[in-house]
Amino acid sequence: MAKELTREMLWEAGAQFGHQTKRWNPKMKPYIYGEKNKIHIIDLQQTLWRLEDVKKLMANIAARKGKILFVGTKKQAKWIVKDAAERCESFYVNQRWLGGTLTNLKTIHLRVKRLWNIERQEKNGELKLLPKKEQMLIKKEKDKLEKFLGGIKGMKELPQALFVVDPKEEHIAVREARKLRIPVIAICDTNVDPVPIDYIIPANDDTSRSIAIITHHIADLYGDAMGIKMPEPQFKPSEFTRRDGDENRNSRGGQYDNRRMSGRNERGRDTHYSHKAPNSGKEEAPVGTEPVATTSAPSFNFNTINVVDNDLEKTLSKLKVDELEILSEGFALPKAKKAEMVSELSKHLTIVDNKIVKK
């Protein structure tokens, strides 16, 4: 059952922090409580009221046996969106939004069918009969399709609602949903235009803790309405002790700007980036600040690891912390939190023939 959110929980997650006052959108004024040190403070009571509206929407969607599409392509939102969608048996997009994902669903289905065909060939052993070069090309094609379409390969019809972490970042997805009259739920920061959004959730959309607590709450509301027995989040919001905003909060152009670091410090935010979420792409996630071990590490038998759904990150996440530490030492990686170790090990390992091997 969905745990009731309180203002204290949202405050602890840093959901109240908006953008600098000079970067606000005046249309967000009704959701702003005030300002401090030239930073807007979001009214968290408004956030709670808006979540109650979303709860009613979830009941309506559940009555129609509909699904939700979760969208979040920002670094700090990718893994959260995937985890939340999988928990409530819905769909997600956590890589670049492909134009026409909603408005041209038939074409997207053709690419999904291609992905299914490759998976069927792998399962039947047909790929092993092909030349090695062709096998490699098909494997690359499969990885690319899985990366962009893996979260929606079971979506046979349009979703009943679209949940977006940052509507400014995901404006194409919002525009497609509006065109098809699909209700849009979105976490709206103080720099967002709320007009295209049907269900506004005013909150900080740049920190992992804020994104996680709201996204998982939306998943819980949907799961409760559908009567789904949901597992616990793979990485809980409470695991994040640092309020790590990304470059997007300091620079609208997406590039890091040291001249604007003062704004982050005025919020009381830590400027370190050592606690990042795991990601399956090529983006590198910073690791902890502990010194790298130089001693030889004990060997680890990869054959003892049970591969889950041919997914490296999911497989590593099932391991115990001490097992991850042994693996990390084998690559001269520092001991860190579980999420960090999973992220770093994913850069050094891969899955071949349903077995984990070194790259």
From Swiss-Prot:
GO terms for cellular component: cytosolic small ribosomal subunit. Pfam families: Ribosomal_S2 (PF00318). Keywords: Ribonucleoprotein, Ribosomal protein. It comes from the Bacteria. One of its GO terms (molecular function) is structural constituent of ribosome. SUPFAM superfamilies: Ribosomal protein S2. Residues 232-295 are annotated as: Disordered. One of its GO terms (biological process) is translation. InterPro entries: Ribosomal_uS2, Ribosomal_uS2_bac/mit/plastid, Ribosomal_uS2_CS, Ribosomal_uS2_flav_dom_sf. The keyword Ribonucleoprotein applies. Residues 239-250, 257-273 have a biased composition (Basic and acidic residues). Gene3D superfamilies: Glucose-6-phosphate isomerase like protein, domain 1 (3.40.50.10490), Helix hairpin bin (1.10.287.610). PANTHER family: 30S RIBOSOMAL PROTEIN S2 PROKARYOTIC AND ORGANELLAR, SMALL RIBOSOMAL SUBUNIT PROTEIN US2M. Belongs to the universal ribosomal protein uS2 family. This is Small ribosomal subunit protein uS2. It comes from Spiroplasma citri. The gene is rpsB.
